[in-house]
Amino acid sequence: MGNFFRTKVPAVSPGTSKVFGAALVTAAMALPSLQFACAEAAPDQGVVSFKYLHYKDSQIGDGVSVITGASSAGSSSRMGVNAYSMNALVPVAGEWSIGTTYTSDSVSGASPTYHSSALTKMTDLRRAVDVELTRYFLNGSLSFGTGYSKESDYISRSFSLQGSLSTEDKNTTFTLGASMNSDDINPVTLPGITYKKKVYAGIFGITRVLSKNDIVQLNLGYSNGNGDFSDPYKLYDNRPSERNNTTILARWNHHIDMTDGTAKVSYRYYSDTFGIRAHTFEGEYVQPLGRGWTVSPILRLYSQSEADFYVAVGAAEKADPTKPTKPTVDAVYYSEDQRMSAFGAITLGLKVSKQLNPDWLVDVTYEEYEQRSKWGLNGNGDSGLAPFGARSIQIGLSKKF
């Protein structure tokens, strides 16, 4: 099935809870991850790659929006990220491979204490290492992975096991995987206190070759999380100690003979016990231009409903952002984190790559992200939240050996 699809047990614990919002996750996902499992055969060449990602987000006032063309002067910067990642895949003895990824990202800027107000300055540095060992068989593969991530207030450990099995004609592949994340959170504002969280996740996928030009894939995922999901850096934030989610992901890749290009479309549905329902549609068109050049425009549409316990911006806070909205006195759970609100988002991107020779490849990806409360499918998000936007650029270089 070539490189059309690679299924991987989903990451079940984002980095630091105080920083990584929807836009940052979108940018961070562009970094390389261990996706060597479930190939049909052991690689005959090794690969070493380097990626650099620069990300910057802001609250948009009234100047020009790159995506909508609307005015958005007076925007204020929030978070900035510089991330470096090195990735290596090494074949071993014809039936094995070892893959490893090292990532270092520095974060600086300001994060809201409630809703999109009371920005608090912060800086942090995260380092992460992932290792994956894969054994290849005649009609399948089996992979074991482990990872470790550390920053000033957050330590995450992960383990994963995933296997694939293909039919004799190689036209259908079944994938089954499981993972576990164990996280320790030590808020700098609460010295001596440690919060813990564990998340178990599983995935089942089917990939099918329909024709020489078409491949489809369907993945079903489920995760169960227990521990502290509250954000200790928010003014009012007390979330349930259990969070379960279900995901459905459908993909279709179609090769167009006339242009030698490939259209890639996907749809992802997400549902969790916090009450959030989310839809993601993504389209990408990969067009070779000759002389080793390839260009790929990208469109991503996202919409989510609000969590059951989200507290919207009140009238007093709308009039004076320095006056936070208090939860009702009888509220057991509550959050004023804008990531728990209902919103919609649009991402436009462009990737350009150049095959320098059979072994060397360089690529650049630029993405522009904008988020609005009124862009959700139901159209009734929290109007008191400031619009949000982000830009990212990623540069990659890889070499086969």
Residue ranges of model-derived segments:
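Outer-membrane beta-barrel "beta-signal"
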Residues: 348, 387-401
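Short sequence motifs at beta-strands and strand-loop junctions characteristic
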Residues: 42, 56, 76-80, 121-125, ...
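Residue-level signature of outer-membrane beta-barrel architecture
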Residues: 41-42, 90-92, 135, 165-167, ...
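Cleavable N-terminal export/targeting peptides
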Residues: 1-45, 375, 401
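Outer-membrane beta-barrel translocator domains and adjoining extracellular loop/strand segments
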Residues: 60-70, 111-117, 154-162, 185-193, ...
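Transmembrane beta-strands of outer-membrane beta-barrel pores
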Residues: 52-58, 104-108, 137-139, 148-152, ...
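Repeated loop/turn-to-beta-strand initiation elements of outer-membrane beta-barrel proteins
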Residues: 96-98, 139-144, 169-174, 213-218, ...
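Membrane-embedded beta-strand positions of outer-membrane beta-barrel proteins
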Residues: 48-52, 100, 144-146, 174-178, ...
